[in-house]
Curated annotation (Swiss-Prot):
Pfam families: DUF758 (PF05527). One of its GO terms (cellular component) is cytoplasm. This is Tumor necrosis factor alpha-induced protein 8. The keyword Amino-acid biosynthesis does not apply. Acts as a negative mediator of apoptosis. It comes from Xenopus laevis (African clawed frog).
Amino acid sequence: MATDIFNSKNLAVQAQKKILGKMASSKYIATSLIDDTSGEVLDELYQVTREYTQNKKDAEKITKNLIKTVIKLAVLYRNNQFNEEEIGLMEKFKRKVHQLAMTVVSFYQVEYTFDRNVLSKLLNECRELLHQVIQRHLTAKSHGRVNNVFDHFSNCEFLAALYNPFGPYKKHLQRLCNGVNKMLDEDNI
């Protein structure tokens, strides 16, 4: 005899994750779910990724994967799906992302302080914490999306190109850091 237990709340969360994951594929719908400043930061990340990779499809995939991950994480968080240990990991993840954001801006604002290894290490620490937070909740495909995003942004060559003061991405970095700084000021990261 099957012991399947129907739980409407779990079903609703699964549906939300699925629907919002699909909706994140549409730029129009994704921007309606994300505030203006975050949208501007995501647009800059897309632009610099597209120019760096010289591949529109890869840049779109990385950006979509980032948006889908953020939306699914928000759905889980808002629906109280995390146990006590995961809540602790989530808080640690949020602090690490805040530290990363402050470091990104600091490296831009203070000349000769940029260290690609420091940024790459922080990004990889965020990745590991995120995997731990979502381990029980999201599929292997979602974990692959996380890796796709972090593999790109933690790449030391990408970071060096982005922060090169004489490189082609200087304006992108400026707009990116202005947006991240605004998110920090608004306590949004």
